[in-house]
Amino acid sequence: MCTARTAEEIFVETIAVKTRILNDRVLLEAARAIGDRLIAGYRAGARVFMCGNGGSAADAQHFAAELTGHLIFDRPPLGAEALHANSSHLTAVANDYDYDTVFARALEGSARPGDTLFAISTSGNSMSVLRAAKTARELGVTVVAMTGESGGQLAEFADFLINVPSRDTGRIQESHIVFIHAISEHVEHALFAPRQ
């Protein structure tokens, strides 16, 4: 029988996951390197794309908003697009082809070498996200995979991997948001912070 966890138990679990991340130099270095990659890309005129399904789609859209809007201080927008946000494209491609190709087809029409794709999937095995990552690699687009502990099949296509050390979907998604904020803040400060 499955019993509901208390709020206290969930907070203990989320703190434990964040502590594992804090002690994982590889993950923390990956976040810094991803931020540096975005900074270099933006300086060269590149764009950033994100994709995911369900809660990961919400994370993708949140990330795009941090880049096109702002996180810490007012500044010019940065090019970023959550690929699921165009509902007409999504429903047309899903209807006329299949759902697994919705993100890949959007990339084929918009992405170019030097751009970056954030492929977000807690399992690392979402077929639509996998196809997007494969297409991105074929197009010369850098792939950042954001997954759970195993990395799933998505790890095979990743230039950079953020694999949160957990198998709990909620804890993975919470950690993805922390990484999204950390990367966004790093990029924003590097590109727009006033020089002292």
Swiss-Prot record:
It catalyses: 2 D-sedoheptulose 7-phosphate = D-glycero-alpha-D-manno-heptose 7-phosphate + D-glycero-beta-D-manno-heptose 7-phosphate. Its cofactor is Zn(2+). Coiled coil: none annotated. Pathway: Carbohydrate biosynthesis; D-glycero-D-manno-heptose 7-phosphate biosynthesis; D-glycero-alpha-D-manno-heptose 7-phosphate and D-glycero-beta-D-manno-heptose 7-phosphate from sedoheptulose 7-phosphate: step 1/1; Lipopolysaccharide biosynthesis; LPS oligosaccharide biosynthesis. Changing residue 126 to A: 6.6-fold decrease in catalytic efficiency. It is an enzyme of class 5 (isomerase). One of its GO terms (molecular function) is zinc ion binding. InterPro entries: GmhA/DiaA, Phosphoheptose_Isoase, SIS_dom, SIS_dom_sf, SIS_GmhA/DiaA_subfam. GO terms for biological process: carbohydrate metabolic process; D-glycero-D-manno-heptose 7-phosphate biosynthetic process; positive regulation of DNA-templated DNA replication initiation. Binds 1 zinc ion per subunit. PROSITE patterns: SIS. Keywords: Carbohydrate metabolism, Cytoplasm, Isomerase, Metal-binding, Zinc. The keyword Nucleotidyltransferase does not apply. Zn(2+) binds at residues 62, 66, 173, 181. Belongs to the SIS family. GmhA subfamily. Homotetramer. Interacts wit HddA and GmhB. This is Phosphoheptose isomerase. It comes from Mycobacterium tuberculosis (strain ATCC 25618 / H37Rv).
